[in-house]
Amino acid sequence: MALLKRFSSLYFAVLFLGLIGFRPASGETLDEIHQKAVKEGGTLNFYGTLAQVNAEKILPVFEKRFPGIKINHVDATSDKLVARAVTEARGGKTLGDVLQIPLENVVQAHDQGLLLDTNLPESSDYPVGLKGSFWVASDLQYFIAAWNTNQVKKEEEPKTYDDFLNPRWKGRLIAEPRDLEMLLAFAKYRFKSDEKAIEFWKKIAAQNVEFHKGHSQLAELLVAGQAAACLTCYSHHYPSRIKKGAPVNYMLSEGVASINGTAIFKGAPHPNTALLFARWIGGLEGQKVMAQGGRNPAHPKVEPVEKTRTAKTYFITASDLKEFPKYDKIWKEIFKLR
């Protein structure tokens, strides 16, 4: 009975927070929120897929900026983090404060009723596709084309994806089999037509594209000269390799961007601390730290440290995610993937 009473109290507390939202007083500064956050125990439970190589450069800056707060980084794949949060919520105790994972999984968490509608003031600096009522973009990953400079002559380097329709590329291309975002983005934003996008990728498929799982593996295959070009690589994989002398180059004229988002858990044990981090990471200050930490900042006014942002970008937005199954099926049919 005591356990049931405890669960009921927690349930209604979470429900209440979800209905009214957790918002600071109007015009409240980060330093004012910091004062409240320290009184909550000095801990931020950060559920995030932020790679350790980036986290060790980014998270300590927050801790130094806001003394008295230490970040407990719960690091796992995005699906495991959502599953963990669901299990905790069903058990009647929310443990996470902030969630920072790919947007697809942020939306899944919201559909499970785990996230708070916040409408952070910092989100006003972002375009519509990079924010929502319960999230704001933290960083981006750009799908671009790259090539081995030993195998591709300077005059043959691609300027746009259309250049890959040239017969010279047949049997020389690699890609990631799960990157249905390329088809979706081309259909929605490049061609604004399913028919034209499908026709384009069917022509690409006729070039006998070879598929390999893992974007890091694609980059290594390209560096090793086992393929001439990659169609669905991550732009941030190449600057460091080029600095080390790898014979590769990449195209930034156009590309597809997937979004990582930041959100606050309903019933977060440290609500002011969660709010502080979400506002900091979404603002200019935090976004500059993200860039210095090796990520592609989402803020329109903050440039990445390396040249990794595409000139023309087709963003995968929250509204697109519900159509993933549709385009995944078509993508697999086009390339005869299982």
Annotate each language-model stretch with its function.
Residues 144-151, 187-190, 258-273, 289-290:
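A bilobed periplasmic-binding-protein/Venus flytrap-type ligand-binding module shared by bacterial periplasmic
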